[in-house]
Amino acid sequence: MSVTKNTIPYNQYYQKRTHIHVYPVEFVVRTLLGNYPNLAMNQDSYFGSKLLDLGYGDGRNMPLFHNIGFKIFGLEISQEINRLACERLEALGIDAELKVGQNNCIPYQDQFFDFIVACHSCYYVNEGSSFNENLIEISRVLSTEGVFIASLPMRDNFIFNDAELLSDGHYRITKDPYGIRKGTIHKTFKDKDEIIEIFDPYYKDLSIGYINDNYYGINVKMWIIKATRK
């Protein structure tokens, strides 16, 4: 969610998505409400907890967060995206505090949030920065014992077709069938061991799953994680 130079394409993309009703991403629903052998979630802790929806896009997960009792905060790359989301949320009767920021610049004090959800967002990296800088900033604003839920792309996810390798698993996107991500930098993750190594300085109780779907020619391959802040 660090794509400053692509702000205009993102604004235009979300300006076209002005319908009131939006629907949550499946892995977010499953992580928060499911029951799985390799996932421990205290669902009794949700009500009243402060949750940051990092790079929330059209706000599709916010009705879910509202329904299960979270206090909702959202971060996006432009005030225009925030404005569009505010209109939708007001129509749905949902309260949320929305701010402009980046993955490596989150305008909140240390340990402010109890939960952070980064649905297809935290791996966007600013020019001259790195995913580790994103993770340090995300960890700064998450409370001790707070929960981080995120998706992380595999190398053979569709968006990396013909992408330019930079360094340390970072790629510059050269093609995007949706026309909004060309030129942005994303971090990929090759396996579970790499994820564990990167997250271990800041997190414990790491649960890792994955998504491998083909939506009629769009191959979506993502790691999904839940981690507890040390």
Language-model region placement:
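Conserved S-adenosyl-L-methionine
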Residues: 204-214
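Helix-to-beta-strand junctions that scaffold the AdoMet/dcAdoMet cofactor pocket
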Residues: 126, 142-143
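Conserved class I S-adenosyl-L-methionine
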Residues: 1-47, 149-172
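A short, conserved alpha-helix within the catalytic core of class I
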Residues: 126-137
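Short alpha-helix
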Residues: 185-202
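A short acidic, Gly/Pro-enriched loop at the edge of an enzyme's catalytic core
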Residues: 104-116
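Class I SAM-dependent methyltransferase SAM/SAH-binding core
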Residues: 52, 59-105
